[in-house]
């Protein structure tokens, strides 16, 4: 029997980063993908004009009238890939993330039986592993990862206890099961999209990929990490052991509210004992914000209240007012 090549739809979410988007779209159109779906989150930098000038039958552009954030953009794009393109597999990425040359061929060459999703190995353009996209095994579900995390915490290296190691990225390393993979180079089967549904657009930014993939795993879907499928992430965002300093300040709200949402899924019955530890750690971050330390604490407190209540209905305009920000 002849083997049928699975169709692949690529979903890219963009907002006012035309310089990044042009590289990503060119990279995608140079690889054997069947559909390229670009969700333009109300960009004002000429993105719409540039996209309208492209002439490739594989390209489908959805322009939102408002910025829906990454979560809203991925929700729209994944729905289009599932329901309109009806692709066998959908791969998602930000506008600054893109498949390395040969990545799609490497994915097609895989034995995909038994996997509902595949996460790529994400690197910076200079070859360094991109920390913010490093997959992990949930330590609350994996005793080995839990013990490794506890052992490394006194050394300030708890994160290394449950995230994949550098050796797992080496060429020839096996595909490994993981519980979380980011929305940069995550391939989702049609069955996974039908079973797991779509990301919640109310998350706006941050943590949508963690929450989505953790919920996939909790539903029994299998996610693999494939080191041979390589993606580039052209980002300057810094991810250190202590986390990031977020600007503009409205981003603080989404980071910590959504983190609590993800911790609730990950920790299960351990969530409430974990909350005081998280709050103590997070409030210490105020010192990193200098003259904005008091504002950081105000935003954090509201984020925590909403996160603990499971509240996702606060409008973006309300969050902008809370953070005294004019950013969209």
Please provide the spans of the model-predicted regions.
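Glycine-rich, basic loop-to-helix element that forms the pyrophosphate-binding segment
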Residues: 64-84
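A short, conserved alpha-helix in the catalytic core of glycosyltransferases
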Residues: 185-186, 191-198, 202-229
